[in-house]
């Protein structure tokens, strides 16, 4: 019965994580149409790519037995994120931005290659699992921290304009699914990052219900029009900066995340 329940939550996590990975599609369609990345940042997609690669590697049978569902979603996520990165490279706003993306991509490839080579050539058995699990967990937690910027923005503006309900719900459900999957499999490298993702998703939902009636940036009391306008403009800039990171949430398995248009996607382990 426990195996069936674990399989169920693993499949559920795969489905929800896929939604999170695909959430920035609208943004990338805009980039393709305008043939420019404009002010969008490609950093979150490079980080999510690394997260997915490490998590997919961790889930392979010779690294971590009985975690193949972790590999399936993160393998899929790796392909999706790689496509996003390629689009950024093609439509980079200028040569400097393109070189920056290439630099980040080279770092991603170097880190992943190092983890793979060390785990294959120097480690075996449980030592290999622990090493790869730690690497994946560290970057999963970093990805789950992405929503913090959006939550700060919501509290500052008292508006949920930049934090869509469905995306926040997906982040919570994704993190929760993989958290339970990890509990049933007694795997701390899945439990820890996705526990963080589930908690942050819950906080997002709480903030949404607190400020759900405010659909536009609020004007802080006691501020003049100029100051209020500055706050609104600042809010827009912050939203644009974080725009591509929330995805979460998608985990090591994709429970860990993606941010598109002010949203986050996590990646799951």
Swiss-Prot record:
Binding partners and assembly: Forms homooligomers and/or heterooligomers.
Major localization listed first in the record, in broad terms: membrane
Keyword Transmembrane helix found: yes
Keywords for this protein: Cell membrane, Membrane, Repeat, Sugar transport, Transmembrane, Transmembrane helix, Transport
Organism per entry: Sorghum bicolor (Sorghum)
UniProt domain MtN3/slv: residue ranges: 8-96, 132-215
Location within or outside the cell: Cell membrane
Cytoplasmic compartment residues: 28-42, 94-100, 151-164, 211-269
Function: Mediates both low-affinity uptake and efflux of sugar across the plasma membrane.
Side of membrane Extracellular, spans: 1-6, 64-72, 122-129, 186-189
Protein name: Bidirectional sugar transporter SWEET1a
Gene Ontology CC annotations of this record: membrane; plasma membrane
Any one GO molecular-function label of the UniProt entry: sugar transmembrane transporter activity
Superkingdom, natural source: Eukaryota
Similarity section: Belongs to the SWEET sugar transporter family.
GO biological process: carbohydrate transport
Record-linked InterPro entries: SWEET, SWEET_rpt
Gene that this polypeptide is encoded by: SWEET1A
Topology relative to the membrane: Multi-pass membrane protein
PANTHER family linked: BIDIRECTIONAL SUGAR TRANSPORTER SWEET1A, RAG1-ACTIVATING PROTEIN 1
